[in-house]
Amino acid sequence: MNSGINYVCVATEMKLYLPYLKMLLPELVILGLNEKWEGFITKYKLLKHYLSLDEIDDDTLICFIDAYDVLPTKNIIDFERNYKEFIKHHPDVKMIVGYDVVDNVVHEHLCQDIFGTVDNVRLNSGQFIGSAKNIKEVINYILDNTSNFQTDQIELTKYANTFKKEVYIDVNHDFFYVKSRPLKQVVLPTTGLNSAGAGAGAGAGAGSGPAFIHANGNGFLNDFLLKEHGIYISDKERIFHFIENVKSVLKKIIIYDLIYIKKHLRLFYNLLLNNFKINGHTINEYDKDLPLRQELQ
């Protein structure tokens, strides 16, 4: 595919839908293959190094996508044109990111509590597009100003709240269609997408719809592959996908539970510091260097 966009992902191994992503997007650059995963910060560290390469000019368009659960749609042929048309109308935007949709109300509440929101809208960090210069500035700022990197989604949400004009959340699914359906099939909806085209909802001009679909939260893209690209996944591979995704879901539950617990423990601790009094003084007034305080910062 001839494109002025550099497509990049981070993956330590070739599994799940990554082989199909590479098949459908041969120019895809895979960072971190066969390397050790060191947590979510690995994504930004590897991407930062990639953006520093001599062959990457400031004006190079960079589209980052998650490796294991994202695939291109047929609309990708209009992706570059739609992006440039959008930026023409929104020059302050440094990055377009996905908008995460969840069917389950409880799931949505937990996601908002863990990852945070931007004006009550929840972005998804698993796909974004912008110039190399702008992406580099965003990533460098996050890495330079984050002492405790939790997940790329949490840190990007913090950035978006600080610099709201710089991050556009694709609420109309003009560029990315993101759906959180753990262990369920994700396909493009037959209705509800902006049929007027990419960016039309924000006055950017005509297009054809989202260029990528993201089965966020360990969803399946088997039905999408068959319907959109005529690619059939065997029963054996489907079983493998199911097992891999179940394992990943369990890992995420542990990781996100720890984040959730620590967040609420921090709130309780601060409440205790400022409200529990001894001899008329709060604990906060007695000692500002408590070990637990330092641990929860």
Predicted ranges, named:
Residues 121-199, 203-230:
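Catalytic core and acceptor-binding pocket of nucleotide-sugar-dependent glycosyltransferases
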Residues 18, 44, 69, 73-76, ...:
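Generic preference for well-ordered alpha-helical elements
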Residues 180-199, 203-296:
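C-terminal catalytic/acceptor-binding lobe
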Residues 17-26, 110-112, 225-231:
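Short, aromatic/basic amphipathic alpha-helical patches
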Residues 29-37, 95-100, 151-155, 170-176, ...:
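A generic structural motif
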Residues 71-115:
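Conserved donor-nucleotide/metal-binding helix-loop-beta segment in metal-dependent transferases, i.e.
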Residues 1-61, 250-253, 257, 263-293:
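N-terminal anchoring/stem segment of glycosyltransferases
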